Amino acid sequence: MASENQWAYDIESLVYSVVKAKKENSLKTKYPNIKFTQDEESDSTAKFPTVLIQSMEPTEKNSDLEKKKIYTVRFTTQVTVTTNAKRTDALRVAQELAQQYRDLLFDISPLPFVRKSGKIWTAIFRASRTFDWNDKL
């Protein structure tokens, strides 16, 4: 039997799936090799741009007095876009994804910014939102 708190444990995979479903095809028109992942490492050949989406310490914010039911979770995800092409590619992909998170009622902080290490451009932002047990995404 699934826990009545399963919704809280599934937020990471749900948010990842929704964002990927909404943005992957539209981004593939401009970036045909784009790869979405939740894994920091892979044995396969690198594809660029790569979009790494990871949760950052989801936090229980409200529960019943007996601590049996989670009512509210503060969820933060970090999005990291890497490319070996141009700075603007990393930034554009990150900005499109940030807007998708905004459309899903997330707060963005910091806004997407870019850094370079070697030949790789990296754009990063974080998106945060509070989820209640009966919220729909």
Question: What kind of feature is each model-predicted range?
Answer:
Residues 68-85, 121-133:
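Oligomerization/assembly interface segments of phage tail-like spikes and tubes
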Residues 92-137:
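Acidic-leaning, charged glycine-interspersed low-complexity segments
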Residues 42, 66-68, 116:
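Residues embedded in well-ordered secondary-structure elements
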Residues 4, 66, 111-114:
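Beta-strand-rich interaction surfaces with strong enrichment in secreted/lumenal proteins
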Residues 80-97:
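Short, positively charged, low-complexity/disordered linker segments
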Residues 55-58, 70-76, 97-100:
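Short, low-complexity, polar/charged sequence segments that are solvent-exposed and flexible
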Residues 1-64, 87-92:
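Small/polar-rich, solvent-exposed N-terminal microdomains that initiate assembly or binding
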